Amino acid sequence: MQPTDPNKFTDKAWEVIVKSQDIVRAYQQQQLDVEHLILALIEDPTSLAVRILGRAEIDPIRLQQQLEAFTQRQTKVGKSDQLYLGRSLDVMLDRAEEIRERMKDGYISVEHMLLAFVDDERVGRKVLKGFNVDSAKIEASIKAVRGSQKVTDQNPESRYEALQKFGRDLTEQAKSGKLDPVIGRDDEIRRVIQVLSRRSKNNPVLIGEPGVGKTAIAEALAQRIVNGDVPESLKNRQLISLDIGSLIAGAKYRGEFEDRLKAVLREVTESNGNIVLFIDELHTVVGTGSNQQGAMDAGNLLKPMLARGELRCIGATTLDEFRKFIEKDAALERRFQQVYVDQPSVENTISILRGLKERYEVHHNVKISDSALVAAATLSARYIADRFLPDKAIDLVDEAAAQLKMEITSKPADLEAIDRRLMQLEMEKLSLAGEEKVAAPTKERLQRIELEITNLTEKQQDLNNQWQGEKQVLEAISLLKKEEDALRVQIEQAERAYDLNKAAQLKYGKLEGVQRDREAKEAKLLELQSQGSTLLREQVTEADIAEIVAKWTGIPVNRLLESERQKLLQLESHLHQRVIGQQEAVEAVSAAIRRARAGMKDPNRPIGSFLFMGPTGVGKTELARALAQFLFDADDALVRLDMSEYMEKHSVSRLVGAPPGYVGYEEGGQLSEAVRRHPYSVVLLDEVEKAHPDVFNILLQVLDDGRITDSQGRTVDFRNTVIVMTSNIGSEHILDVSGDDTQYETMRNRVMDALRSHFRPEFLNRVDDTILFHALSRSEMSHIIRIQLKRVESLLRDQKISFEISPAACDFLVEKGYDPVYGARPLKRAIQREIENPLATKILENTFISGDTIYIDQDENGLSFTNKAPVKVSVTQITT
């Protein structure tokens, strides 16, 4: 039979014939024969031919080597474009055609060629003689791969062993110990088993947020099936996870995807209930395939089988995707029984982490302390709001362990410091030795360098040996742990197979020996650690977890682990370094923060919400900045919104984002996006009385529930923010009684009346505290001038110019800048006018240059600037 018509062959078979011609040319031969065709057939290790040979217990690599040796012995003619068909290949292809007819297939396929090769007298029988196979054995393995399917089109290979190709056997992975242990979730697993045991519509769908453990429930079921801890209807069943992605991948032509899916479903049906399918991301099934013209929706292929109970299927999807894709298709939805999977509590998460601890220790070759597991659960629940337990806690432990492993395998910091110092000394030595005339001091320096190099080299050698020794002990412990883990899996497999003799040998022989070796190595490591001279640490601690949380969220790690009591006791003194006066305001803010941190308020509300009332320039915004710097170690943790920008009704939507269909919908809101990206910040709503009344409807949610929902349906968490609103309402009443304490209550009542007349009661009722800021006195202004002058001092320091000022000059500036109506802002303008402007002119005129000391004093014309101070008083020494 001449292989000239590709329509008689399947695509893969014709591809093999074309490829065999390249092999002939590579061997510089002219006759295309059986050996070239079979070499092309088994060249791809994932091909159908290799799978068939594997089932027949034929090693394809050994077969390839024998065929290559046979081909090498054939006649070579050099390079030739013209090829001839060998007689034995012609006979083999005729035999393949006969086999096709006998098997009632439509096209000559790879398996027909392979079966014909077994009976080939020239090559086949000779090569296969050593493998102890015959055509019956090959035919049996073909039947095992093909099942009951016929070759009805030119791409039948995609339908063979469809489940093996497009699925992952979870029960097989459970047998070999590749699945992580699943702790808890008993109610959900029992509900899944209950639904699977029904006569019809026996298809549970696991619905829950991402990361709560839906896939883990399917893996737990696989482990229970393997252990026999299931009802009779599920015993000895296979749980196979279907990969929709690989099912779609490469399906180029119309109907090709449906063919693959039908092949999978046929295998499941033919198993007579022995196979349970698990479809992760179930929503991907709906609409899959229907994008091709005339193609069917994969969901529609599943519906009849799901309803009749022929297909037992477990689905898993998130709440949003279930609503978006599956609820729309009511016919598909009613065939699934919903099993809701909630986020576990912190206590349950700790139990889950304890169950997984050993797996992560073996993988990373580190130890994980129990306090680290508790910290991972509690800190992730408190600080990582946009993800779910237990996934976020597991990720924390995994990353902390990976970081520690990286430290173990990297060179220790002490050793790196010695390496760098040695390099510096070597360079200095070369530089000094290169001088033509070496002076006596230089010789002494060279001798000192050589002595230091000798000492450091010895120390480097000792530290290097110690590091390598510790590393070897840790690696040995890791290998023994892995061996111990593998032995435990073998013991479980032996016990399941009732091979109690083998189980006893492994448990009381090998396992005990490995455990003794591991304990000896751990004792050696403990001895090294007890001497206090270890370079490497091998335990993940609470501090490591906190450091990872800090990297994820931006909270400084030292703040996270600092004693809460000590931190809160320092709050007033820290705020007073930046905010002068306003004792009542500082104390009120500090008290509210203390209440929140001591757990004496609702954890579902913001840390604190304050309404700062008072005239302009008295420190309302500065207190918010100081609070941000103290709580979050950065001024940029302040999210500042000028509420005068939200005076019109249409601008209110900018806070949480434009509604769908409007310009800017994709961009999100200015308030919601700022807090979503920086969930740990002080939110300052400046001049809040200028905002449109509708703004306060949004703020009600924030102040009461600690969260808002933006225009895209995302929940933004405000529980870890401090909300500060400033207002000038009633400031005229505060100015009227400045410095008079007797009228304070009257003034406060007037301000509160003004406040109540402007803001609605439900808004004021949700604010933690309304704080009145007093007008600044002269003595307070004297303190503020010192803070303001430090800014000038830092500007001059950049130009290497010193700056000193007399107390009289300070008093002059206070006099010029004091205005109780405008607060501290005129003081800044006075400094700019009286100091910065003249200094700028004098620096440009070169009156003062780098290295000078400027002394500022008062004279009859105002302020004088001289280069040499008669009495030097620095800014920090100014007294009021």
Curated annotation (Swiss-Prot):
Sequence segments annotated as region (Linker): 344-554
- Set out the biological process GO terms recorded for this chain's protein: cellular response to heat; protein refolding
Which SUPFAM superfamilies does the record cross-reference, listed alphabetically?
Answer: Double Clp-N motif, P-loop containing nucleoside triphosphate hydrolases
Residues covered by region (Repeat 2): 85-148
- Protein's UniProt keywords contain Ligase: no
Q: Which residues form a coiled coil?
A: 394-530
Entry's Gene Ontology molecular function annotations: ATP binding; ATP hydrolysis activity
> Binding positions for ATP 2?
614-621
Subcellular location(s): the record lists: Cytoplasm
Region annotation Repeat 1: residue ranges? 9-74
Residues that bind ATP 1, according to the entry? 208-215
Per UniProt, which keywords does this protein have?
ATP-binding, Chaperone, Coiled coil, Cytoplasm, Nucleotide-binding, Repeat, Stress response
**Do you know which PROSITE patterns this protein is assigned to?**
CLP_R, CLPAB_1, CLPAB_2
Annotated stretches, region: NBD2: 564-775
Start and end residues of each Clp R domain: 6-148
Q: What does this protein do?
A: Part of a stress-induced multi-chaperone system, it is involved in the recovery of the cell from heat-induced damage, in cooperation with DnaK, DnaJ and GrpE. Acts before DnaK, in the processing of protein aggregates. Protein binding stimulates the ATPase activity; ATP hydrolysis unfolds the denatured protein aggregates, which probably helps expose new hydrophobic binding sites on the surface of ClpB-bound aggregates, contributing to the solubilization and refolding of denatured protein aggregates by DnaK.
Would you identify the family this protein belongs to, as annotated? Answer: Belongs to the ClpA/ClpB family.
Summarize subunit and interaction data from the UniProt record for this chain: Homohexamer. The oligomerization is ATP-dependent.
> Which PANTHER family did the record assign?
ATP-DEPENDENT CLP PROTEASE, HEAT SHOCK PROTEIN 104
Q: What is this protein called?
A: Chaperone protein ClpB 1
Its source organism is Nostoc sp. (strain PCC 7120 / SAG 25.82 / UTEX 2576)
Q: What is the lineage of its organism?
A: Bacteria, Bacillati, Cyanobacteriota, Cyanophyceae, Nostocales
Q: Which gene encodes it?
A: clpB1
